[in-house]
A protein has these predicted regions:
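Positively charged n-region of N-terminal signal peptides that target proteins for export
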Residues: 1-4
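N-terminal signal peptide c-region/cleavage motif recognized by signal peptidases
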Residues: 12-14
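A short, N-terminal "cap"/entry segment at the start of jelly-roll beta-barrel domains
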Residues: 19-94, 182-183
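Short histidine-centered beta-strand/loop micro-motifs
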Residues: 92-98, 160-162
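His/acidic/aromatic-lined binding-pocket segments of jelly-roll/cupin-type domains
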Residues: 95, 102-105, 140-141, 148-149
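Short, conserved beta-strand element in jelly-roll/cupin
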Residues: 98-113, 117-119, 127-134
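Short acidic-glycine-tyrosine-enriched beta hairpin
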Residues: 125-153
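Ligand-binding loop in jelly-roll beta-barrel domains
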Residues: 142-147, 153-177
Length: 183
């Protein structure tokens, strides 16, 4: 798991340099900013396998029967950078993050992941995130335990066909993209 966290940070830095420019990301500039993430990991920059395993267990226990996803923050540096354990039981809407890259490591389970393409009927979830009804285009990848996934900013991503028996658990890292002259 320690090597997973290091690879996670390196690939996220690479995502910041390779973000795609789309017009979908420009439509949410006047929408209210999302509230701060919840959890008790504020300014928590180190973790270990035992703590991550504990967070996975808590996440699987707190998910409600009608809920598609539950998450527990593991690492955080202020409000801008955070890593969370997510337990996904069923698909959530396809998304685009306009101001951050996202990195996933599949801890357990499997699903299909659609990357790229265009959101159909996009709406603003908040000032930097769009959701849609479906994805037009994009490439489908089957992901399983041990898969590393890099999602640059402005890239559509959508987990579907999630394992119905065990769901899918991922470690998810969000890193805001710097302004072009700050990298």
């Amino acid at each position: 798991m320690k090597s997973s966290l290091m690879v996670l940070a390196l690939l996220t830095a690479a995502a910041q340099a390779s973000g795609q420019d789309t017009t979908q990301g420009q439509m949410c500039s006047k929408v209210a900013v999302m509230p701060a993430p919840t959890g008790n990991a504020q300014n928590r920059m180190l973790s270990d396998d035992a703590e991550v395993a504990d967070r996975v267990g808590v996440t699987k226990k707190i998910i409600k029967p009608d809920q598609a996803i539950a998450a527990q923050v593991v690492l955080s540096a202020g409000l801008l950078h955070h890593a969370a354990v997510e337990y996904r039981r069923s698909p959530t809407p396809p998304m685009v993050h306009t101001r951050m890259a996202e990195f996933f490591y599949v801890v357990d389970g499997e699903a299909d992941l659609i990357l790229g393409g265009t959101l159909t009927h996009p709406t603003c979830r908040n000032s930097s995130n769009l959701v849609g009804d479906a994805v037009e285009g994009g490439v489908t990848h089957h992901v399983t335990k041990g898969t590393y996934i890099l999602v640059p900013e402005n890239t559509v991503h959508y987990f579907t066909n999630i394992d119905k028996r065990q769901g899918m658990t991922v470690l998810d890292l969000h890193v805001p993209s710097p302004a072009p002259d700050q990298y």
